[in-house]
């Protein structure tokens, strides 16, 4: 402990013990805080010996400061302790920890301002690949072969898919028109697309010349001429002129302007190489929802529309063009669902497990429906049983509690059972059937059966008058309908 406590001594230790932990608080810094700080530095793999000097404390502060936002409370307490110790070494009077932190922040801000001012006085350019050499001159660094190789590889693998545009923008950061032309000239194939790109560049250059006419008269000494459309495209300007425009005061960003023209042409080419519109992107019956979303957003990337329109397409068409299984789930989520919620809800839809689950649910519902129908049919077909012994309903003779009836249950006579009964039942007319008297009572009794078909009459247009004998015979066969005897014969 003695070695760790030897960080401060004499007047510095007295000044240390006068500083309060919090503004207006009673607790003050003690020797134990230095011992704790030494142990914490060892835990963070830092040298505790740095606490003995102000320069060492500054180095520790530089190491700890980037981790303050994500660090623990112990780390923040260690940072505060080192800040107070730094001003004790500097012999700057502070009353508490808060005042020490405010002074440290003020000192760091002044240091940043001095650094920025020195950088501005030197005139160091931020335009890469245009840099300043040791003599203070602005020089150009050509694109590296690795950058060109990456660009060519993208064109060969992706052709002109939507991801080519951000790749071109990243590789051409800070490039001059000459660098951009070098990148375009390295594209070997796709000459039809390159010709479309040239046409777009020429149109934009002509529009630039129309909006920025040439100034009349000579150019004042010490000034550079205004760039024309062909100068921006790098066809009529030298590399030195391009550097002067890009680093002048005020600068003319010819590289960025030419880059925007190229990206405009690339958008048209991407549109041509992606003939499928966003309206044609539909999810297949067995296609996973994730693959469908990938195709949807890849096509949406090539659409020439504003961000608001693309947002509407995402909210509407993504759900509308999904397959029925996913569409049911997405509609249940509601219109405010995020893409993450959609992906999670539709995960596995369309796969074998989902199909098996849907089929099992359908079969279960069909089985339940069939069981319910069978139950309902049995309920409708249930008939009322009647006891042959007592004649009451609700039970059968086997379970009847009444005294057993003697004799036949059909005719009531003893000596035989119902199955051996010879007594015939009467029909609904009260007669025993079959009858020994010929025709049943509900048939016409005296009608003669014809033995031959009737003779045909060949006298056309003549009216035949029935004979009196025939009339009497017909009256005998067909009595008046008012008599029930005509229907039932000799029935009583």
From Swiss-Prot:
Residues 14-33 are annotated as: Interaction with membrane phosphatidylinositol 4,5-bisphosphate and RNA. A motif (Nuclear export signal) lies at residues 16-22. Residues 8-43 are annotated as: Interaction with host CALM1. The modification Phosphoserine is found at residue 144. Residues 7-31 are annotated as: Interaction with Gp41. A motif (LYPX(n)L motif) lies at residues 477-487. Residues 73-77 are annotated as: Interaction with membrane phosphatidylinositol 4,5-bisphosphate. It comes from the Viruses. GO terms for biological process: viral budding via host ESCRT complex; viral translational frameshifting. The record marks 128-129, 359-360, 372-373, 427-428, 443-444 as: Cleavage. Residues 185-223 are annotated as: Interaction with host PPIA/CYPA and NUP153. A lipid is attached at residue 2 (N-myristoyl glycine). Gag-Pol polyprotein: Specific enzymatic cleavages by the viral protease yield mature proteins. Capsid protein p24 is phosphorylated possibly by host MAPK1; this phosphorylation is necessary for Pin1-mediated virion uncoating. Late-budding domains (L domains) are short sequence motifs essential for viral particle budding. They recruit proteins of the host ESCRT machinery (Endosomal Sorting Complex Required for Transport) or ESCRT-associated proteins. p6-gag contains two L domains: a PTAP/PSAP motif, which interacts with the UEV domain of TSG101 and a LYPX(n)L motif which interacts with PDCD6IP/AIP1. This is Gag polyprotein. It comes from Human immunodeficiency virus type 1 group M subtype F1 (isolate 93BR020) (HIV-1). The gene is gag.
């Amino acid at each position: 402990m003695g070695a760790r406590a030897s960080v401060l001594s004499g007047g510095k230790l007295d000044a240390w013990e006068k500083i309060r932990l919090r503004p207006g608080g009673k607790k003050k810094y003690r020797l134990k805080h230095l011992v704790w700080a030494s142990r914490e530095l060892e835990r963070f793999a830092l040298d505790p010996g740095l606490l003995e000097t102000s320069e060492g404390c500054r180095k520790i502060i530089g190491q700890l400061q980037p981790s303050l936002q994500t660090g623990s409370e112990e780390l923040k307490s260690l940072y505060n302790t080192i800040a107070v110790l730094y001003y004790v070494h500097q012999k700057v009077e502070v009353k508490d920890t808060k005042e020490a932190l405010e002074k440290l922040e003020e000192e760091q801000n002044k240091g940043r301002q001095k650094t920025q001012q020195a950088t501005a006085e030197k005139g160091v350019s931020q335009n890469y690949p245009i840099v300043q050499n040791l003599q203070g001159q602005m020089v150009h660094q050509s694109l590296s072969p690795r950058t060109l190789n990456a660009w060519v590889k993208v064109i060969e693998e992706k052709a002109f898919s939507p991801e080519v545009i951000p790749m071109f923008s990243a590789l051409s950061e800070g490039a001059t028109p000459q660098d951009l032309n070098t990148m375009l000239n390295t594209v070997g194939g796709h000459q039809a697309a390159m010709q479309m790109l040239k046409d777009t560049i020429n149109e934009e250059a002509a529009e630039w010349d129309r909006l920025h006419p040439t100034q009349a008269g000579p150019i004042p000494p010490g000034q550079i001429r205004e760039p024309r459309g062909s100068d921006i495209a790098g066809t009529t300007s030298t590399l030195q002129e391009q550097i002067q425009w890009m680093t002048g005061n005020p600068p003319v960003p010819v590289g960025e302007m030419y880059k925007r023209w190229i990206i405009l042409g690339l958008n048209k080419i991407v549109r041509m190489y992606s003939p499928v519109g966003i309206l044609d992107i539909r999810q297949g019956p067995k296609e996973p929802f994730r693959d469908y979303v990938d195709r949807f957003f890849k096509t949406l990337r090539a659409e020439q529309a504003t961000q608001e329109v693309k947002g509407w397409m995402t909210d509407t068409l993504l759900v509308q063009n999904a397959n029925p299984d996913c569409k049911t789930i997405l509609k249940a989520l509601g219109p405010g669902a995020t893409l993450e919620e959609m992906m999670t809800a539709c995960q596995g839809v369309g796969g074998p497990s989902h199909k098996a689950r849907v089929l099992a649910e359908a079969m279960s519902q069909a089985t339940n429906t069939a069981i319910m129908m069978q139950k309902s049919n049995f309920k409708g077909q249930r008939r009322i049983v009647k006891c042959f012994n007592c004649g009451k309903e609700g039970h059968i003779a086997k379970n009847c509690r009444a005294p057993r009836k003697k004799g036949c249950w059909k005719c009531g006579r003893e000596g035989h059972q119902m199955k051996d009964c010879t007594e015939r039942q009467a029909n609904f007319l009260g007669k025993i059937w079959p009858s020994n008297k010929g025709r049943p009572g509900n048939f016409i009794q005296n009608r003669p059966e014809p033995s031959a078909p009737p003779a045909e009459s060949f006298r056309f247009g003549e009216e035949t008058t029935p004979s009196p004998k025939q009339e009497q015979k017909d009256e005998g066969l067909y009595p008046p309908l008012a008599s029930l005897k005509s229907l039932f014969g000799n029935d009583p």
